UniProtKB/Swiss-Prot annotation:
It is an enzyme of class 4 (lyase). Its EC number is 4.2.1.20. The active site is at E49, D60. GO terms for cellular component: cytosol. The gene is trpA. The alpha subunit is responsible for the aldol cleavage of indoleglycerol phosphate to indole and glyceraldehyde 3-phosphate. Keywords: Amino-acid biosynthesis, Aromatic amino acid biosynthesis, Lyase, Tryptophan biosynthesis. This is Tryptophan synthase alpha chain. It catalyses: (1S,2R)-1-C-(indol-3-yl)glycerol 3-phosphate + L-serine = D-glyceraldehyde 3-phosphate + L-tryptophan + H2O. Gene3D superfamilies: Aldolase class I.
Length: 265
């Protein structure tokens, strides 16, 4: 059983919903990343999604784009991100860490070299935004051979064929993008999410995390009423951008604790 599977099994046994926060590695400053990861756990995160900075993050809105730019300006690389996961693992052996990013940095390192390095660092899942599941079989096998779950996105526009393709290659969980558009988009249509999830579950025998458009305890709780897990990203990255210097870690912990409380209520 992978760390991600164990986490979702424990949540199901307690009838709880998963909380999956996203932060960009190296933002707002590189020295804070490991502390921020621990703050997320202290606040009640079940899985951490760690964004790998990239110069052209096409699926991301302006908030996460700016975070990527700040991290890259500070010289943050994929190798550095793996080092932070290794450091986090020195004192946390239980919380799954999922890297989320784009194909380019992985391909520059080489898929096999990346899979080996990520597995050795303690990475549990990898979500490559621009890897279509139909063309990912060998990549998925490479990930699993190194103890990593390949995670894929589904969207309101995903066809049955795409959902089936994800069902064949994904493990861990799938990430359902609840809105058309980029991360940080505004309104959330709960009814359409609720209608879509059973169709996904027909083809994908995995927990479904729902993200995009979740900004506060209220929207998190609404999504938690229909999904297995709630993914929250842009709102956290915005919070870190706005937090006064020296207060980022505690601000993040407190915000996540509020979301956790709402999910468990």
């Amino acid at each position: 059983m992978s760390r991600i599977q164990k986490t979702f099994a424990a949540l199901a046994a307690q009838n709880k919903k998963g909380l999956i926060p996203f932060i960009t590695a190296g933002d707002p400053e590189p020295g804070l990343t490991v502390d921020l990861m621990h703050a997320l756990v202290a606040g009640g995160a079940d899985v951490i999604e760690l964004g790998v900075p990239f110069s052209d993050p096409m699926a991301d809105g302006p908030v996460i784009q700016r975070a990527s730019e700040r991290a890259l300006a500070n010289g943050v690389s994929l190798t550095q991100v793996l080092q932070w996961v290794r450091e986090f693992r020195q004192t946390n052996a239980d919380t799954p860490v999922v890297l989320m990013g784009y194909a380019n940095p992985i391909e520059r390192m080489g898929e096999a070299a990346f899979a080996k390095a990520a597995g050795a660092a303690g990475v549990d899942g990898v979500l490559v935004v621009d890897y279509p599941p139909e063309e990912c079989e060998s990549f998925a096998v490479l990930m699993r051979d190194n103890g990593i779950d390949p995670i894929f996105l589904l969207a309101p526009t995903s066809t049955d064929a795409r959902i089936e393709a994800v069902g064949k290659v994904a493990s861990g969980y799938v990430y359902y993008v609840s809105l058309k558009g980029v991360t940080g988009s505004a309104t959330l249509d709960l009814d359409s999410v609720a209608a879509r999830l059973p169709l996904i579950k027909k083809h994908v025998n995995l927990p479904v995390g729902v993200g995009f458009g979740i900004r506060d305890a209220q929207t998190a709780r609404a999504i938690g009423s229909v999904a297995d897990a709630v993914v929250i990203g842009s709102r956290l990255v915005q919070l870190l951008e706005d937090a006064p210097r020296g207060q980022a870690v505690e601000s993040l912990r407190a915000f996540i604790a509020g979301i956790r409380e709402a999910l468990d209520a």
